[in-house]
Amino acid sequence: MDVAHLLIALVALLGAAHIGGYLFNAIRQPPVIGEILGGLCLGPTVLGQLAPGAQHWLFPSTGPTPGVLGALYNIGLLLLVYLTGMEMRGRRARTERRTVVWVAVSGLVLPFLFGLLVATAVDLNGLAGPHGSPATLALVFGMAVAITSIPVISRIMIDLGVIDTAFARIVLAVAVVEDILLYVVLAVTLGMAQARTGDSYGLPKLLGIDTVGESVAYFTIAPLIFMLPFAWRGRMLFDRLASARFNLIEGRAPAAFRMILVFVMCVAAIGLGIDPVFGALMAGLCASGGAREGANPLPAGGGGSGAALREMTLAFFVPVYFAIVGLRLDLARHLDPVFFCWFLAFACTVKSISVWLGARLAGQDNSSAANIAIAMNARGGPGIVLASTSFAAGVINENLFTALVLLSLVTSQAAGAWLGRIVRRGLPLTVPEKPRPQESDEAEDAARIPA
């Protein structure tokens, strides 16, 4: 009976997620919104109001079903972050470097700082979880304002047929820089929460790190030490492991080899005392752009040896993860409309103005800067990962968890609608970068030199 009950719950979650994703994809909106709304319909917000007995029977709080769904939720989270790492492959914006630099600096530093300032100026203690503190809450708030979604925005641009444009190169290059830096900040935040509770594990526990100051220092350095070697030589290491003679798994089941890589990297991250999502991120970076993975971005194509894992992840694990995120939302009890409205307005305004300012300083015109700003506002998967990990660590409570998830959904939908409107009108998303005066003078001098 327990197995039958679990299978019924999985069928309901998977079916609701895919139906919701299909409907939103049909209206040219990010499928992730539909997948979460599918879970929302099965949770206390909808089904719990219409038929509370059926909702409690389908998703009980005790027994084997919640344990298995919790495990699938965590695996889906790790594989989603793995795919995010796969998205961080080299779409190099060589001719748009000035825009990338200005937008990355202005669009990350300013929103994060403004988020910190508001979080310290406004009393947000009512949004802290059992292990949260004013400092960790402020860091989560700042990250929520500054974060950008690589998977969602890349999927939007693929669907619109603009993935090979200068606009896509700018947005994705900036998003990669932002997300990597914000993942490091997330490691510091979770480490501070560990120090507050004394529930450290791995190397920090062996070293006896138990003060906030020691935790901040350790969790700033440890993720960088863990990330840098794999970001620098990870692809080469992956190719060597995949092509090694002793690697019998790659030839027989490439998806199994990649899943083993993800889990091994997650265990290594846990051994260092940092959240396993960093191991999944590094596994994705190692596997991205390798000789066996093909050159096309993940959502577009399906080529390469890792296609089977990607298809299984997007068909099962990620929809179940997003559906459970929706299932855990209780809008009737944990949505504060006043807080969410000003939080949404503040986050979107600060992020948009900061990105717009950076793009304008780089030489983009008003419309191009606005397009980049709205695209960079899509928080999507990373915003939901931030909500999930900080809520699981006890840094935030259900009210802020709900607000962060809704912020990710609304901004992703808005970015998709805006960019779709621009493309359908045949308007340019960006203008070519204008050469600097020095570069123009050098070009004119070169033209005057006789052949």
Residue ranges and their predicted role:
Residues 199-211, 235-257, 291-306, 424-451:
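Intrinsically disordered, low-complexity non-transmembrane regions of multi-pass membrane transporters
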Residues 42-99, 239-343:
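Membrane-interface junctions of multi-pass transporters
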Residues 52-64, 122-132, 195-214, 243, ...:
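Membrane-interface helix termini and inter-helical loops of multi-pass transporters
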Residues 35-47, 102-116, 173-187, 247-266, ...:
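Small-residue-rich segments of transmembrane alpha-helices in multi-pass membrane proteins
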Residues 1-13, 64-81, 133-148, 215-227, ...:
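Structural signature of hydrophobic alpha-helical transmembrane segments
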